[in-house]
């Protein structure tokens, strides 16, 4: 592990904490057991989305060669979303090897996930059944997502 990699991770974490008032209504980040490579994120479902005001916990695992490779990001809170599989893995271009570059950072990942909650991508789904429902019966899709959130998610209380 290169000390500049650790410094980059520490700088990102410090910046997020220093600016936390800017993000407090959208997400919260904490290291897990003071492990610089493992972060817990709580995201508030975006306004006017099917996930509005629900709290979603994610885990971010940074590798030894971050920022030269993307972190592993997954939902811990169960979620019904066409771009998230049942293990919590997220289908998002910037998390893929060919979509990642070292100029991206954790903040850009989090904002991209928040946007994905509001604007799912039916062209690149993990859950093709949900994507098909979204395209063919939006009312049933909306109900399915809302019902799942009510059952499996907690409201944002941060």
Curated annotation (Swiss-Prot):
EC class (word): transferase
Could you tell me which Gene3D superfamilies the record lists for this protein?
A: Ubiquitin Conjugating Enzyme
Which transformation does this protein catalyse, written as a reaction?
Answer: S-ubiquitinyl-[E1 ubiquitin-activating enzyme]-L-cysteine + [E2 ubiquitin-conjugating enzyme]-L-cysteine = [E1 ubiquitin-activating enzyme]-L-cysteine + S-ubiquitinyl-[E2 ubiquitin-conjugating enzyme]-L-cysteine
Reply yes or no: does the keyword Ribonucleoprotein apply.
Answer: no
The molecular function terms in GO held by this entry are:
ATP binding; ubiquitin conjugating enzyme activity
Active site positions: 91
**This protein's pathway:** Protein modification; protein ubiquitination
| Alphabetical list of InterPro entries matching this protein | Ub_conjugating_enzyme, UBQ-conjugat_E2_core, UBQ-conjugating_enzyme/RWD
Q: Which residues form the UBC core domain?
A: 4-154
Report the protein's function.
Catalyzes the covalent attachment of ubiquitin to other proteins.
> Can you tell me which family this protein belongs to?
Belongs to the ubiquitin-conjugating enzyme family.
- Tell me the protein's name: Probable ubiquitin-conjugating enzyme E2 L460
Q: Which species is the source of this protein?
A: Acanthamoeba polyphaga mimivirus (APMV)
């Amino acid at each position: 592990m290169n000390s500049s990699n650790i410094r980059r991770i520490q700088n990102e974490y410090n910046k997020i904490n220093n600016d936390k008032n800017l993000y407090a209504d959208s997400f919260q980040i904490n290291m897990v057991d003071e492990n610089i490579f493992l972060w817990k994120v709580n995201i508030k479902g975006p306004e006017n989305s099917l996930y509005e005001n629900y709290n979603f916990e994610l885990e971010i695992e940074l590798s030894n060669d971050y920022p030269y490779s993307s972190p592993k990001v997954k939902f811990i809170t169960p979620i019904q979303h066409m771009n998230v599989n049942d293990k919590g893995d997220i289908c998002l271009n910037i998390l893929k090897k060919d979509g990642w570059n070292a100029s991206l950072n954790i903040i850009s990942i989090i904002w991209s996930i928040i946007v994905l909650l509001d604007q799912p991508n039916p062209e690149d789904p993990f859950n093709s059944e949900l994507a098909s429902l979204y395209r063919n019966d939006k009312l049933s899709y909306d109900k399915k997502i809302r019902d799942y959130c009510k059952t499996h998610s907690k409201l944002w209380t941060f």
